[in-house]
């Protein structure tokens, strides 16, 4: 597999040799967004409320997020991509719930959406596991996006939106958190990318 950017990072990048990651996925994301140990942030495991302190499945109201601090300091803040640090309600029929074609007014409590945790704007998904061609829980701010255009591919859509946000920058200090779904399963790749590796 041709990986020029990863190769360049390996050759010229900084190596952290006294660094560890205490957990995977959602807990690490919560730590990154708050600067706290994942249990202090409220996500000790994943985004299910286990009704135990440190395992509430969403970033705690006591945990201040980086964009909340930066917004108070005069920054414009933007989040593009996968949020996946808010409680994921369980449904009896998970397949029905995860079907993008079934519309929902909200995907978690609105107070836990990125635009209510310090980000001025958010384009992306609330949940973590999505179809790359027709993503479930795709929102603009608090509003669900009911359909995507033909040929939609979430990795490209997130990159394009991030570039648009950067181009809109003025003299206001700007912070963007870009969180791709890739390389999370279901690992959907564009046909032309797959063809390169046959």
Where are these regions (language model features)?
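Formylglycine-dependent sulfatase
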Residues: 1-198
